[in-house]
A protein has these predicted regions:
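Catalytic, metal-anchored helix/loop core of enzyme active sites in primary metabolism
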Residues: 153-157, 165-168, 172, 184, ...
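A conserved regulatory-domain signal marking ACT and ACT-like small-molecule sensing domains
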Residues: 316-431
Length: 431
């Protein structure tokens, strides 16, 4: 290693890769002063060199051959920004086994194979850091691992997908319906051409798996996380929520309960007074609770070229400091506990239920009898003025109930002739 230069390689030169290159170049002098040496990008792995060459002054940095990176002893840090499971997994494992440190922003990979990658880093006495894999530019992985390490963490929850938060903000503030807000998000570049991963909660689910694993020191993988999206939310639901002093947000929730970990993503009604209710547009926020710190919230841009690059470069600098101090690879995977992850039907929540029923005497009594049969306590029943074709619209708010019991009650309601339609079911955050 040159005393004044540590060399790195970028895998991928898309939005985030370009951002990382820009940050390292633009802040070169200041960063050198901060950490005592320069970080230099020696190689950039791309699929299409001709296309990538248009985005960089020195095209000699570009390569389409992994061997030029893995076999170069001068390259000490590999920055993986390719996305996807393979070949990213193979590249990262081979880099770690070759004694190279790795920074990754790959939530898809880490949510499934994070344990394997961290163990490989520990075995080879190198670092594997992934701050940018969750919530872009918001520092949350490092605080959970370091600043909050003295806490028993009980809850990590938040808004961790900017696309869906933008859509719900437009629906709330401008009365848009879902499809119109999605079209606007696509037009402005917040939503991908195929928005499924965002609007169905899959993107947020991967982040919840990572957050839960780090916060609770127990392995949670993506398949453990229940996911539900926002496509069924209507402006009417948002209006009724507002009448009750609540907002609808797509929340990623992880709780460390006495009988296991709860991990899920779904739309939820939260009090308008809750700090997360004020997080709008494409911003993200993560709210944590620990036995010592109590409540804390981290807020900022959850995606984008430079916010995500900020987190990646922060990890690079941490590794450089460790290299200079000779203390790399000290801690591997911290999932030393074996806490079971609960099935969604065994979680407990309150529920908002909107349905259309026959407009006649006795229907509400029938409903409450069915709820009572399955131990579903009703906090509130509101019959709305809306009446169409002999039907009345009813809103029900339950107390906390086991989800499996609630689902069984709902199925019985669906089979009643007096219940014409169950329009919406949304979980309610809080007591």
């Amino acid at each position: 290693m040159n005393e004044n230069v540590i060399k790195a390689a970028l895998l991928g030169f898309g939005t985030v890769g370009t951002g990382v290159y820009k940050v390292l170049k633009n802040q070169e002098k200041e960063m050198s002063a901060k950490i005592g040496c320069k970080v230099e990008i020696k190689k950039i792995l791309v699929r299409n060199i001709e296309k990538a060459a248009a985005k960089i002054e020195d095209a000699s940095l570009l390569t389409s051959h992994w061997d030029e990176i893995i076999n170069d002893p001068e390259i000490e840090i590999v920055i993986e920004l390719m996305g996807g499971i393979n070949p990213a997994r193979e590249y990262i494992l081979s880099a770690l086994e070759a004694g190279k440190h790795v920074v990754s922003a790959n939530k898809d990979l880490i949510a499934v194979h994070g344990h394997e990658l961290l163990d490989a880093a520990h075995e080879n006495k190198v670092d594997f850091l992934f701050e940018a894999a969750v919530a872009g530019g918001i520092p949350i992985i490092r605080p959970l691992k370091q600043c909050l390490a003295g806490n028993h963490m009980t809850e990590v929850m938040g808004i961790v997908n900017g696309t869906t938060n933008f859509i719900l903000t437009k629906m709330t503030q401008e009365g848009m319906e879902f499809k119109d807000a999605l079209a606007l998000a696509t037009e402005l570049g917040y939503a991908e051409a195929d928005p499924t991963a965002d609007i169905e909660g899959l993107d947020a689910g991967r982040k919840v798996a990572i957050l839960a694993s780090v916060a609770f020191n127990s392995r949670v993988v993506f398949n453990d996380v229940y996911t539900e999206g926002i496509a069924k939310i209507t402006s009417k639901d948002i209006h009724y929520a507002k009448e009750m002093g609540r907002d609808i947000k797509l929340l990623g929730v992880a709780r460390n309960e006495a009988d296991g970990i709860e991990a899920y993503v779904c739309p939820m009604l939260i009090p308008s007074s809750h700090p997360l209710a004020t997080v709008n547009d494409s911003y993200n926020a993560v709210f944590v609770n620990g036995d010592a710190v109590e409540d804390a919230m981290f807020f900022g841009r959850g995606a984008g070229e430079l916010p995500t690059a900020s987190a990646v470069v922060g990890d690079v600098f941490d590794i450089v400091r460790n290299i200079l101090a000779g203390c790399c690879g000290r801690i591997g995977c911290t999932c030393y506990k074996n806490i079971p992850v609960k099935k969604m039907e065994d979680t407990h929540n309150r529920y908002f239920l909107r349905l259309k029923v026959e407009d006649r005497c006795g229907v509400l009594a029938e409903m409450t009898a069915i709820f009572a049969k399955y131990q579903v306590s009703v906090a509130q029943i509101i019959q709305k003025d809306t009446k169409v074709e002999g039907c009345a619209e009813v809103v029900v708010i339950t107390e906390k109930v086991r989800e499996g019991d609630f689902r069984t009650a709902i199925e019985e309601l669906r089979n009643r002739d007096s219940v014409r339609k169950i329009s919406t079911i949304i979980r309610v955050y809080g007591k």
